[in-house]
Amino acid sequence: MARPRRSDSDGNAPRRPSAGAGPVIVDDYANLSGESLLKKTLGLQNHRYAKYIGPTDEHDFALLDLRLYDDLRNEAPADLGSFRKVGPNEFFHQYADADSPSHAGEVEVLDRIERIVAPHGEALIRLYFRIVHPSFPILHKKVYLEKYGRTHREFSPPLLAAVYILALNWWSYSSELARSAKPDVAQLEDIAYNTLQDVSQRAKLSTVQAGLLLLQRPGSNQAWQLTSQLVAIGQDLGLHLDCTNWRIPSWEKGLRKRLAWALFMQDTWSALIYGRPPHISETNWAVQPVIGSDFPESAADEDEEEGSTEVEKGRTLFSAMIALTKMLAQVLEDLYSLKAETQVKNSYDTTKAILERAKPIQLKLRSWYADMPEALRMDATRVGKLSSVGYLHLAYFATEITLHRRILRSLSHNTDPYLIQICRSAAKARLISAMDFFNRLKPEHLQSFWYFASKFNFALIGTFAGLCFVTSVSHDEAEFYQRRLLEYRWTLRVSNKSAEFLEIASGILESAVGSLLKAADSIDSRGFSFPMLQPHAEDGDTSMEHQNFSPSAEFGYYDDQMEP
């Protein structure tokens, strides 16, 4: 049974001006009467935007430090705009939005967005904070509701549209909305993507927020290009820096950290998906780990309406995903970067070199999985609550698969058969576990928020099965992998009506392995050519037996299947 809507005083429902009152126009948040979280904000100012001044900029820190900064705002006038000092060597150049030609007509665009969703704007915002926000906390709920309570015209158009777009995915989960006709999401998407390019010229934190939310859409296009753009914007905003001691509101410090790590995750998972080098590197990344105080909401803020997401579980999930993504970044750097490829090629033994690099990451992954909080286990579901933990477990399997994918690629006819057996057995265990995971998904998992990479990660399981298939060392093994791949493809196909992203995942998988399976089906499976298949595998030839091979103890952990 749905709980009655909370009163405005608890910050859970937006306060709007009465029908006869005009919207409150806020030129500068510092001039707001009464209490406001936004009074000293750096990254979400109204009618102004701020760009970080880097260490090699024409405005040298020593020269900037000589300027007179007022005590209230830590600002000093500039020839154009103003400078703001937030730390000993951290300065921002602030400009007026009006100086940008793209600013004209923004109010009309915001009004158009509201007309598209009218009269359901408030209900959609409640729906977004019920289902999406707990598992992907890149907004500040009270700040968002404070602004919306005054007027929708305080928002950046792409952010306002993006929140509505994602909320529309759960339209039927609101008893208030389910009885009404659904707004045209295509119109909202057109506005969101077009205005995102406009506001990128005068970017704020809301620009990155909008971009990240749009990238969570199941059918988002040009994701790599947009991700690249968001990383550049994030650097303009100083998101790559440690803001712990900056002179900005404490809520904004937490928001910046959450947003920075969300950007890091977007960049890393996009790099995996599209086979590109990540833009963000450890060398120029000073963001501190998120801690409890960086998340302003708690269980007390949780919505009790059926079909909501648990707030504290979402916070734990987000933190765990950050930790996992750091390990994925290490996999990409140590096993797939151009530098790593060159070093491995120049090594005496390619497989041994790969295993040496993989071992410490594998141990970290095993420890991460073993130490996973109970709240994030697949069976830790509550009646009437959606659970997004599925995307975390899927991301774990994708990371494991990416690691073992590189190991399998290193194997050749010259690799000792015993080492081949060890490596392939470990890869097989990961594949079976990943496929079994899919069968454990419940409706409360499938209907929740899923991270953008999930559709690709589901397809990656099938791609890995295809790799195991074509690198098989015996016909029996080849038939096993062919059968499992066919079963997985079928299961994904018949399940794709459960969620939109599964339908997309099914299409991605078909593109990746459809031709392979068609070719394998068109001929006798024992006549199919496998590069790793040795002639002696069928006739019992023992010429390559491993009687003189003694794998070093450092690779012994591969004997442990480490099934989750």
Predicted regions and their residues:
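Elongated alpha-helical scaffolds that mediate protein-protein interactions in large eukaryotic proteins
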Residues: E176-K182
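Intrinsically disordered, low-complexity activation-like regions
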Residues: R5-I131, L166, I322-K352
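Non-membrane alpha-helical segments in proteins
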Residues: R126, R130, P158-E176, Q209-R217
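Extended, leucine-rich alpha-helical cores of fungal transcription factors
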Residues: L110-E122, V143-A161, K182-T283, G307-S367, ...
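Short, flexible helix-coil linker/hinge segments at the edges of structured domains or between repeats
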Residues: H279-E304
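Fungal C-terminal regulatory tails
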Residues: A13, A19-D79, F91, E106, ...
